[in-house]
């Protein structure tokens, strides 16, 4: 049954030079531009429970994953970290680089920068206020400039459809390496225009990024916890540049995703870990489907980064224009129930088509939790709950480990 259309969103084509596309949003998918927010709650939580980088907040499991990576994944990740290090190092000092050209007397540079970013290969480019409420606590002093340029780079289509696989991990992390170099070029261009440009590496961000991408109109949050961008859904890798260049902010857009996900729910139904939840909740001031991190993490670590929730998303596979047109024409979710969209394989468990999920023992989900030092204390509590009193040597060893964990938090990076 053909649906009534509420509005049509016009967006630039997938790559620079492509014609604009139109995305029809059905009336029954209309909610709000961006994401439903309770601004007072976002501000409150940022003050009393500031966000922290996963490498500190989830430090215990970030160390643990290295013990379960396959040799191939571990080798590739070590190589990636080495290749990224100079890029992350240069991003860290980029705020202090002086503009190299004369400023253009306050001329609005939004479209100059957008065009340059598109020419460099970024598929989605948007501008918004750098919202300090999403800063990580340990990087509070890093943010120097008021405007955020949100940049999304598409990762390879074919490699992504093989998720979960080492090949798909290449698509993921190779894109980080490529876009970091392109981001550095864009920052150089902004300095030549006479302004500062601070790079926020995709491997060492200073804040949560998705809320600012949504504010800049580059997509909406999907039930899989990822940004669904118009052309490639969550098959995009995100980075930001902050600047003091004069720019005009874009506005959040209602693509219909907030409501569409509740009709689709493919990612929720196909997640092997049952880590995605059907019902939206209010979380730190935003209404969303909240991922259960502790269920996702072991599957991600053991099955090559998993990413099944990305692979099975119709927006990722077919793009938003095709999916929304299909919904308007039929009232159905394009590809739902098909092996092509929903099927996947896990290396030791085989193939799972629509309606079939793997099972795991309860112990599979018993992994280290929380910060490194908190996990050490948890283990210590268990140790002294037994009958034995620790020896002086064990106490010294425990203190050394806690000190080392705390020191690591001070120097840690999201690499
Ligand atoms: S990465 Fe895998 S385990 Fe984690 S939420 Fe997505 S589908 Fe589920
Ligand atoms: S799979 Fe469906 S429910 Fe999940 S993010 Fe994609 S569109 Fe939303």
List where the protein language model places each region.
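Non-catalytic, usually N-terminal nucleic-acid engagement modules in DNA/RNA processing proteins
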Residues: 1-165
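Flanking helices and flexible, charged tails adjoining ferredoxin-like Fe-S electron-transfer domains
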Residues: 1-31, 282-415
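Arginine residue identity/basic-tract feature
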Residues: 11-14, 38, 47, 62, ...
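Compositionally biased, intrinsically disordered low-complexity regions
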Residues: 15, 19, 36, 128, ...
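Short, structured coil/loop segments at alpha-helix boundaries
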Residues: 70-73, 107, 254, 338, ...
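Catalytic cores of enzyme domains
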Residues: 103, 114, 123-335
